A protein has these predicted regions:
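Charge-rich amphipathic alpha-helical interaction elements
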Residues: 1-155
Length: 155
């Protein structure tokens, strides 16, 4: 059986872990908000690039008689028109933002699961503390609660 000091120490450790998890959860939620904003921005960039390409405002310094060869984010865009290149670049940016968003959501879920486990541990510790208090009352009063009730009723 755990001593009172051990139970208090475990309760203190649990409180520290809950605080750390709350901080991690807050950071993960901020990262999720940032990832969502990046995804939204990437979507706006995609729309703007498609609009610009449709209006032939994007040329990427391509000479009219030559092929356009452009490497961007380790992707080689060969024999693509300016509009197709802009569309592909925007799609890649959007995919990156989606991947960051999914990672941030997974981080939030993982931290919430850890928080739930620590909260459960805290509940177990509180139950142990309550049992210890009951045992302490029983030790101080060997007759138990019935004895206390009989004494109160006789007054």
């Amino acid at each position: 059986m755990a001593t009172r000091l051990q139970i208090r120490q475990l309760g203190f450790v649990t409180d520290i872990r809950e605080t750390r998890l709350q901080r991690l959860l807050a950071e993960a939620i901020v990262a999720l908000d940032i990832a969502e904003a990046e995804l939204e921005t990437a979507g706006r960039i995609l729309i703007q690039r498609r609009h610009d390409a449709a209006n032939a405002k994007i040329d990427f310094a391509r000479k009219p008689e030559s092929e356009m060869i452009r490497i961007w984010r380790d992707v080689c865009f060969q024999r693509l028109s300016a509009a197709e290149t802009a569309d592909e670049m925007a799609r890649l940016e959007c995919d990156d933002a989606k991947a960051r968003l999914i990672k941030a959501r997974n981080d939030v879920l993982r931290i919430k699961e850890r928080g739930d486990r620590i909260t459960d541990l805290g509940k177990v510790l509180r139950r142990a503390e309550a049992r210890e208090k009951e045992a302490r009352v029983e030790d101080e009063n060997p007759g138990g609660r019935a004895n206390i009730l009989m004494l109160e009723g006789s007054e």
